[in-house]
Amino acid sequence: MTTTADLAPDQQIARLLPPGFSEYRSVIAFNRDGHLTAAEIRCYLQELVGLLGMTLAASPGIVTGWCEHGLAGWAHITTSGIELMGYPQPDGTEAVTVGINSCRDYDLDAAAALTATTFGVADGHLTTVRTLTLLGSRP
């Protein structure tokens, strides 16, 4: 008998998932001039959710005050969530990450294209990484 202790960490998690359940996580990262605004974040998150065919469980929320000029946004979707974090840099730019987590697969390339268009990111200056894909055992 195989126990989860005999498996690699990603296999351990996959074994614990309900049959047929999957989890997909990815990150989009870029730098931009200036700072994000709450309105920009809300609009972007709503557009991204629609583009990916997801459903909002609640209106996107904004967190402020965790650092000077820093804003974070969270879109609670019915299949998990999407977060956007802005990290102000000493040179006046902002490093931004968008994390997409869902139990349904999604088009990461489409998400990256919307992100580049929305925030004016030049070609070659946006990074995408599919950080985790776990496929639960099938019944």
Language-model region placement:
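Polybasic/polar functional segments that serve as interface/processing modules
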Residues: 1-139
